[in-house]
Amino acid sequence: WNAEIAQNSDNIDENFSTTENRSTGILRNSINRQDTYGLISKLNYSVNDNLELQTGIDWRTARIEHAREVRDLLGGDYYVDYADDNFEDGKVVGLGDIIAYHNETTVDWIGGFLQGNYTSEKLNLYGMGGVSSIKYSYQDHFTVADEVITADPISTYQVKGGALYNVNENLGVFINSGYVQKAPILDNVIYYDGVVATDPDNEKFLHNELGANFGTEKLGVRVSAYNTDWKDRNLTKSVQTGQGDSGDTDIIFLKGVNQNHKGLEIETKVKPNDMVELDFIYSYGDWKFDGDADGTYQEQEYNDENQVIGIQTTEYSYALDGLYVGDMPQTSYILGVTLKPVKGLRLQALYKTYDRNYADWSPDSREIEGDADRAQVWEAPGYSKLDLHASYKLPIKGYDISLNAHLFNALDEVFVQDAVDNSKYNGWGDKVHAAHNAEVFLGTPRYANIGVSVNF
């Protein structure tokens, strides 16, 4: 810092000033200013003792400004910024002036829904439907045109339903199903260079779940199986094309990125007596990409007057089919023991195991160039850890005060909690989706905390 300040304090650049010193290094702030307004309204109506209806509307509008500003000139008098196209030879700026980028976006959203709940001794039913519309705009103040680019409104809808049937006082079976559309975020509709995606697809979720609950005074069990199809996940990839008149970073819009998530979940609680509770939770998932994907690169074409006359499109393909979804263990189980030896005292031990933890990766890394890379991503080693918890509620009449103590990773295990496949920055050797190609993040070593909670 001292060297930078010394340089900036004695740096006359006659191209800009013969008396003031030019800063070559500065401190800057990133700006994110938001103004949001909205209206939410709901109406509840009881048809009878069994049926409840609810409808509502949600309207919101937001304006977001993104920019950077000069925070500290570090000894100099001014700084020269070259990001604004309106100043080809550079713009002289001082404290508080905008640099690097300056754009504004707007988001206009409106939606409505209708839902109903039916309850009876044997049967509970739930259903809802909703629609929404969202519109984006983007304005880059650092372009000569300073044009407001507005995308067409995007409409979505969703339908959900569920049923619970109580076979008897101990056993109930349930089913849930839903279809949800999610509009792509602004970055996947209008990119930072002003390119608007052509007919962006809504992300689609189709979820089905079937299960049962069983409960007695000493035993509780919940079992469920699920299947979720996630269609048309919206992704983008930045590329250095070197095409066009600028050769700047451009964008590939990926379409048809589909995933299938299915699995089984079991929760069990056993209470032999009032002093002991035993818990077992098990989850097995099979989460994979379903099918390959296509990518579309779009670049604006200009005439001699620098006017946009069309869009050039290039197609790409990505090898995704059958690859595991990363960044989340797909198998896990928890064994728990809870003791309540005296009134107010609670002791608990939780032994947690995680397996089939595939490294995080991005679909854009599987672009097909020649032979498709369909090798499975790296699977990090499974791991287990023990957490201990204790709490004691003080027997003080009229006060709700508890003492708490926690010991996490009590056995001080060393384990890989997260990983990145074929890391760009920390991998070694050929990229073959192996351990030496991965970037790993170790879990937190043993640590503890204690505290006091007071409820009023």
Task: Label each residue range with its predicted role.
Residues 344, 353-367, 392-456:
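C-terminal beta-signal and adjacent terminal beta-strands/loops
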Residues 133-140, 151, 164-209, 220, ...:
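Surface-exposed extracellular loop regions of Gram-negative outer-membrane beta-barrel proteins
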Residues 59-65, 120-122, 131-137, 177-183, ...:
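Transmembrane beta-strands of outer-membrane beta-barrel pores
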Residues 1-20, 67-98, 193-199, 237-253, ...:
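Surface-exposed loop/turn segments flanking beta-strands in extracellular/periplasmic regions
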Residues 24-26, 30, 52-168, 190, ...:
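Signature of Gram-negative outer-membrane beta-barrel scaffolds
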Residues 23-54, 97-119, 124, 152, ...:
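Outer-membrane beta-barrel transmembrane strands
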Residues 50-53, 122-127, 170-173, 218-221, ...:
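Repeated loop/turn-to-beta-strand initiation elements of outer-membrane beta-barrel proteins
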Residues 49, 119-122, 227-229, 252-364, ...:
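Gram-negative outer-membrane beta-barrel transporters
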